[in-house]
Design a protein with these regions (language model features):
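Short, charge/polar-rich alpha-helical segments
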Residues: 1-11, 15
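Short, charge-rich amphipathic interface segments used for partner binding and complex assembly
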Residues: 16-23, 27-60
Length: 60
């Protein structure tokens, strides 16, 4: 179970990488940022969570 502080920190990282992927400096950087936020999604899914509209929610 994630604490509220952990959720806020992860959401912040996720949203930062997602935003950077939308306006990358180069194509390689876009791939880098996409990889980062997809990795966060994968780890959250393993822990029983998912991201919806930039917010972490528990899987049912």
């Amino acid at each position: 179970m994630l604490s509220e502080e952990q959720k806020r920190r992860i959401e912040s990282m996720y949203n930062e990488y997602y935003g950077l992927a939308l306006k990358p400096e180069t194509k390689d950087m876009k791939s880098f940022y996409i990889g980062k936020y997809l990795a966060i999604e994968d780890v959250l899914r393993i822990c029983g969570y998912f991201v919806h509209d930039g917010e972490i929610r528990e899987l049912d």
